[in-house]
């Protein structure tokens, strides 16, 4: 690494960005069971088990509400076709509450399979890094002390923005994991609404929302792939310009590309819902 402070500041900001980008590639391929050593997952499973007992109790309540709403009288309930339909609904709803965790894990594994396929086809890995061009390093090192003063201000501002964007990006990806845990923990309660016809829309909405959270990983990976291809071609800088102009142009274009990536990752949930009509 160069001994120049301005170069070091820019490189440190890029290293932070590259580190967070590599963390994203690791996070999107992890499962809730392996995230942070599985400690959080064990607690979530315990909570899910406790919620399951509540869900089964609510199952009966929603079933009774459904019977009262859909059947006009007790005589109608006694009809074989109605009784059979109600029994099948109750059995299916109970199975969904009992095996809801397995259902949710199956949905997650399908989305992870798509993520793995996209990463394999693209051949883009976490090793794709943003690197400070040699032309920028040469221009900065060729500056005198007084010429480098405005460069300090430019690199401080640019480095700070890059660092902030790095943390915003990684926080969004961590937020996806937190949402997965939250959905898993309380799953039995919304799933119990399948027992009643008037309340089943809540259960459908829950499964759609959970599927959208799982599919966010695909949008995040695609966004990172597109950014990696952008980053492989450094911004074009006019070498005949002053060093401060070159650095400002480079940082401006770099931050613009980073803003596009961060914005897409932050809106991944909205993008999925618009694509899938969820």
What spans do the regions from the language model cover?
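Alpha-helical transmembrane segments
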Residues: 191-208, 240, 271-277
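Short amphipathic alpha-helical coupling elements at transmembrane boundaries
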Residues: 23-26, 82-89, 116, 120, ...
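Binding/recognition "hotspot" determinant
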Residues: 1-58
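Hydrophobic transmembrane alpha-helix segments characteristic of membrane transport
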Residues: 58-94, 186-200
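Non-cytosolic segments of integral membrane proteins
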Residues: 94-186, 224-277
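Hydrophobic alpha-helical transmembrane segments
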Residues: 53-65, 157-163, 180
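Alpha-helical membrane-interface segments at transmembrane helix boundaries
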Residues: 44-52, 84-88, 92, 175, ...
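Alpha-helical transmembrane segments and their helix-start/interface "positive-inside/aromatic belt" motifs
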Residues: 1-10, 80-100, 203-213
